[in-house]
Amino acid sequence: MPENKIRSTTILCVRKSGKVAIGGDGQVSMGNTVMKNTAKKIRRLYDGKILSGFAGSAADAFTLFELFEKKVQEFGGSLSRSAVELAREWRTDRMLRKLEALLIVADKEESFLISGTGDVISPDEGVIAIGSGGSYALAAAKALYDHTDLSAREIVESSMKIAANICIYTNDHITLEEIL
């Protein structure tokens, strides 16, 4: 019997020299079949001041995007407050707890990973990644961050290409957004 689990994505966020960039690949796989190559998993929120990306179930992620956007509006664009409140609601709401997705959100000052278990994680070094190829992208980004003069955008581009060459659930159709 074929496996129908949907697997997808690598999302990488890098903050460097006052700039933040977030990138995501476009592949969506079901079992061992590529279903889509050009999915857009990166969004701008709050008049372009907040970047977000998701890994996991697309339907679940869009639900979380909507909830997060409401929190951002409710808390006047405060990224940290919105992230904490979304995680709290996600963890305690019976229906939301069943959603299978992870979010990375970032603005000009902060970046967070938000999970359904109530985790809100801010990276120590300005680099954070999620998804099936997240560990590959994270390793590449940390090496480039520490040992090159590349910009945040260039680090995301290079690291996502590396992840796409290693992870079978990640492709090289990259969507990239940045805040300068």
Curated annotation (Swiss-Prot):
Principal subcellular localization: cytoplasm
A Pfam short name: Proteasome
Binding positions for Na(+) per the UniProt entry: A164, C167, T170
Regulation of activity: Allosterically activated by HslU binding.
Origin: domain of life: Bacteria
SUPFAM superfamilies: N-terminal nucleophile aminohydrolases (Ntn hydrolases)
Catalytic activity: ATP-dependent cleavage of peptide bonds with broad specificity
Active-site residue numbers: T9
E.C. number(s) listed in UniProt: 3.4.25.2
Location in or out of the cell: Cytoplasm
Cellular component terms per the entry's GO annotation: HslUV protease complex; proteasome core complex
A biological process from GO: proteolysis involved in protein catabolic process
UniProtKB keywords: Allosteric enzyme, Cytoplasm, Hydrolase, Metal-binding, Protease, Sodium, Stress response, Threonine protease
Any one GO molecular function term: metal ion binding
Function: Protease subunit of a proteasome-like degradation complex believed to be a general protein degrading machinery.
Family under the similarity heading: Belongs to the peptidase T1B family. HslV subfamily.
Subunit structure and binding partners: A double ring-shaped homohexamer of HslV is capped on each side by a ring-shaped HslU homohexamer. The assembly of the HslU/HslV complex is dependent on binding of ATP.
Protein name: ATP-dependent protease subunit HslV
Gene: hslV
